[in-house]
Amino acid sequence: PDILAVSWIPRVKEIELLGYEVAAFRDGVLDFEIKAFNEQGQIIKSETKQEYFPVYYIEPYKENKILLGLDMSSNPVRWQAMENAADSGLPAATAKINLARDSGSLQRGFGSRVFMPIYRKAVAISNQEERRNNLVGFVSLLFRASDTIDLRLKTLSAIGIDIYLFDKTSGLNSERIYFHPSRTRQENIRPLEEAELKDGRLSWVKDFDMAGRKWSIVCVPAPAFFSRYYKTWQPWIVLAAGLS
């Protein structure tokens, strides 16, 4: 996926906070302070905690400097992915997030963050407890999957296919995170839910892992697909009927 931002998110104990603020000041960040997400997803000044995971470095800087000091562990969606990464030692992605809240620039739509855990060097780590004790912080990537899909589709001819991307990690209700209506459509259509797509519709489905999350891409023929390929399919349908 196309990366919108790269961040370094250290693990900061309360007693270490002053040292980080002084270091940030020396690096030219004069107003560095720890911030947090409130329940409405707005960024506010953080309450005192025993431990923080603030954004300390970020690129591109100019568009995202407002995020410096933002404690990523203050949001449940991000914290869940961070815990998964820290405990497994593997990259872990968040569920769908609103890019307008997670990016300093005016990004539209939805995306995801991937957290990659960093541990102390020269320390043998073999279990979850040792990973937690030796966690230094995270490298985080912010991306929007739709950018990559849209870019790839522009290089292909429009043949009449609607494309869906679902997050099925919860195992209960899948969440639609992307929809690309066929460029052959002349009218706007309502995106369908995964259960509706399974209701007797012809479709191609591919499940795959995305940094610990279970994603599924579903391709469904639009009316133009059948119009274009009807003459090609008809002989095979007649033949199949004759052999049955």
Predicted regions and their residues:
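Intrinsically disordered, low-complexity polar/acidic regions
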Residues: 1-219
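Membrane-interface helix-start motif
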Residues: 152, 222-240
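Juxtamembrane or sensor-core-proximal signal-transducing alpha helices
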Residues: 243-244
